[in-house]
């Protein structure tokens, strides 16, 4: 029975586009979220699996696992749901889907398939992104359980994105197998030994898989290959991978140690956390000695085998079939399967079959021991023969035919001197260019074979010289979180200053990135240390507010500040423009804080006093001065002068300090007589009159 694929989901919100990916459980389409106007990726479960409770549980688990995580190196999940569709028979069927972040780029698997082994610097940057994602998910209590190149996306901007948490499990549920039948709990080439044995997994299982990914990036191939999933799983449990430097001539041996520690058979010998793994890589790439330098993979393997033998020798109490589910690796599908518990007759039959399998396994083990003993004896004989062969000088070469490669590769020795020293030892130099190095151009970075190795006289020694730090543009990480910005910058090949600086910002939220130094877009050598600036959550009162119009300021800073508007007159600022602010310009306030602005109403206005005709001039002048106006006489101003008229007229609104013109005339003086005697006398007379 088949079901036609819908063209839209969630009531038309998600308009489905072309198919961009297909897996064993689901298809992925590019889609348009019409509500938010953004491009998304929609993973739709295959209709034939939607009615399988096991697969449905896995699908829902992915949505739940990732929805609670928010990390720049993990593909975000935006939404999930189930769409009801009609099958060809007309029956209604559910079609579960997950709406995810759309990442435009390539999977790491495709990149390796096309380009082969990656450069050391690219390996470093990809691993930093993967380990950032794992560090975050582990701290959230989630184990991925299927880390592999196919689940790692590299965006067009170089950002690493880990995806497909479909078999992820919470740490407290990590002992459970994923399904009751045909449930994949990891991909064979990246499977940890404990997963291969069906044991409880923890976050170190993810780190083992990450170590396998690092190995494949360095060499272009997985650490173990075979004709079947069983053969590969067996190697993960019991064999040590070929060192990367043996597969890639010239690759520094320190990568052997880092990969070996990450891929330790005994999880107790692995990196304890993703952060510890990441620190070791950064330490080495920055010229230090990583913790992995002291790791011995052969000791790890022998100790692991001894511990497992001891565990098998411990007395055990048989467990009834209904008490513990049987876990088995299916050699046909390459998958681990959980066989459902049985009861009654079924339980007896199951127990009988289990006893038969145990007897067969015991016989097989005895056979392996015998074969192993024979092989060991043969190897011992060959080793002895080889030693005798060498001691008898069967190669017919004297010690004079071999030379020890001198230590010539260091920052202080020039290319010409290195060549001369090698030639003086009877060796030739083959010059190679190291484009991954951040050392100055011409600096010797490595040799192959290494210094101290014995080689035939006349052999060529490969010597790599730095091509100089390659320049690239600083990515724009403005308005991103510190963690996301750091990941993007490191993925672009830069170092990031551990000390983060803060600065005020009017519009960028607290703790989000405001800028970098060097600035975004600037072309600088890879390996340059970038300093990140983040918002303090405070902002500065703008310095250019005074003199601007009220409307333009309110529009320009809308959402950034809360304004209170007051009015006042001003002799110097035009009406409608801002005269002053509080707090003062340059003051630091919280984002969205209050600023009071005063807006000019223009010069102060006063009313011309009610000066009537006949008022003496002196009185009129005093009345004008009392309200801040000046008097300008148009006529006599003596003590007898009287007002004829004023301009502007009484009651007029004029600018404070302006002049009022008073038209005056001389007043009349009245006659009078009087008599007096000596110094005394009396008299009367008329006053002034019109």
From Swiss-Prot:
Catalytic activities: L-seryl-[protein] + ATP = O-phospho-L-seryl-[protein] + ADP + H(+); L-threonyl-[protein] + ATP = O-phospho-L-threonyl-[protein] + ADP + H(+)
KW Ubl conjugation (keyword) present: no
Catalytic machinery residues: 146 (proton acceptor)
Location of region: Disordered: 429-453, 665-690
Comp. bias (Gly residues): 668-690
Entry binding sites for ATP: 20-28, 43
GO molecular function ontology, one term from the record: ATP binding
Residue intervals of the Protein kinase domain: 14-285
Domain (PASTA): residue spans on this chain: 399-467, 468-536, 540-601, 602-666
Its EC number(s): 2.7.11.1
Gene3D superfamilies (UniProt xref): 3.30.10.20, Phosphorylase Kinase, domain 1, Transferase(Phosphotransferase) domain 1
Coiled-coil boundaries: none
Database matches in PANTHER family: MITOGEN-ACTIVATED PROTEIN KINASE KINASE KINASE 20-RELATED, SERINE_THREONINE-PROTEIN KINASE NEKL-3
UniProt family annotation: Belongs to the protein kinase superfamily. Ser/Thr protein kinase family.
Protein name as annotated: Probable serine/threonine-protein kinase PknB
Native species: Bifidobacterium longum (strain NCC 2705)
Taxon lineage: Bacteria, Bacillati, Actinomycetota, Actinomycetes, Bifidobacteriales
